[in-house]
């Protein structure tokens, strides 16, 4: 199951008691700040959670899997996520409990 923005807004409504529209607006504003910072080339550091970074990938050779034709894969910038140690620990502990 996936956690959606609507799910996050619902949790804010239930746990903090803010109305649903404000919760939805808060979630949208949070993600818009992240998008905006990444568009500007900034790193995002969420303490206890992890970091979102931008990485430039160079052009590289590729191959069309259907035809076998060589095609270049263009250079691009990608977003990467590196989980923080606290998140890694919680996931590892949660995984061992689930077994």
From Swiss-Prot:
Report one GO cellular component: cytosol
**Highest taxon listed in the record's lineage:** Bacteria
- Kindly state which keywords UniProt assigns to this record, in alphabetical order: DNA recombination, DNA-binding, Transcription, Transcription regulation, Translation regulation
Q: Do you know which CDD domains this protein is assigned to? A: IHF_A
Q: Which GO terms describe its molecular function?
A: DNA binding; structural constituent of chromatin
Q: Which SMART domains match?
A: BHL
Q: Does the keyword Metal-binding apply?
A: no
Q: Which InterPro entries match?
A: Hist_DNA-bd, Histone-like_DNA-bd_CS, IHF-like_DNA-bd_dom_sf, IHF_alpha
The entry's function note states:
This protein is one of the two subunits of integration host factor, a specific DNA-binding protein that functions in genetic recombination as well as in transcriptional and translational control.
Family per UniProt?
Belongs to the bacterial histone-like protein family.
PANTHER family from the xrefs?
A: DNA-BINDING PROTEIN HU (PTHR33175), INTEGRATION HOST FACTOR SUBUNIT ALPHA (PTHR33175:SF2)
This chain belongs to the protein called Integration host factor subunit alpha
């Amino acid at each position: 199951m996936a956690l959606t923005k609507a799910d996050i807004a619902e949790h804010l409504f239930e746990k903090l008691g803010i109305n649903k529209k404000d919760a939805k607006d808060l979630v949208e504003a949070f993600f818009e700040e992240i998008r905006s910072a990444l568009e500007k080339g900034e790193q995002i550091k969420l303490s206890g959670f992890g970091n979102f970074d931008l990485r430039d990938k160079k052009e590289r050779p590729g191959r069309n899997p259907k035809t076998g034709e060589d095609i270049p894969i263009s250079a691009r910038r990608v977003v990467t996520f590196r989980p923080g140690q606290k998140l890694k620990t919680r996931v590892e502990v949660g995984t061992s409990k689930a077994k």
